[in-house]
Amino acid sequence: PFQPFNRSPQIRYRYTSGKGLQLTGAVLWQLQYLSAGPNGKSEEYIKNSCIPEVYVSADYKVDGLIAGVGMEVLSLKPRQQTTVDDRVYKVNERVTSLSFEAYAKYMTQDWVIAGKTLLASNLTQACMLGGYAVTSVDPRTGEQEYTPYRHSMTWLNIVYGKKWKPGIFVGYAKNLGTSDELVSDQLYGTGTNLDKLITAGAELTYNVPHWKFGVEYTLSSAWYGKLDKS
């Protein structure tokens, strides 16, 4: 869970300056890859929100080097009604999150060096760790307020060679918790009880036109923790 992965219907605009600068903006809707919430992973949360996911980025390309930064905004409505003491209440709940990334890739005839670091917030729709939790509950209506989980993810991949290509991969993910104090044990997301994760791998591939053969070994270690509301 170090690299966001998602396929979604979207409208995308890209501007290229001709001097290596590239600007990208996109609005996305959820279809196959979905956010987590009270009813598991579902498209209903973004449908209730009526606001698409937004992504913007800026890339710079020169002499085999690509470097860039990006930002993502996601706003969901987990629920539209609650039931308290056999009474049904209409509620207006929303959780909004911001995620940021910085990345670079350097390529020569023999080397490929790539890396990325993310400050990720509620990116469960992108196959990442994350989610959100409850910060307050209205005792009369059951309406809840939420705060997103924040995670730091960083990875580095280095590959050398032309026909025979040895390579290494290292990744580190850390649960940074939430910005607000929690009032409930109820969590919505993926891997919210994971404190940190470390992955290291090595590979060797043999490359010829139209074919690639290889072996890879990966070791992953995960540390888990208990919920601390304060």
What are the roles of these predicted feature ranges?
Residues 195-230:
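C-terminal amphipathic "assembly/sorting" segment characterized by alternating charged
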Residues 23-29, 69-75, 168-173, 214-221:
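Transmembrane beta-strand segments that form the barrel wall of outer-membrane beta-barrel proteins
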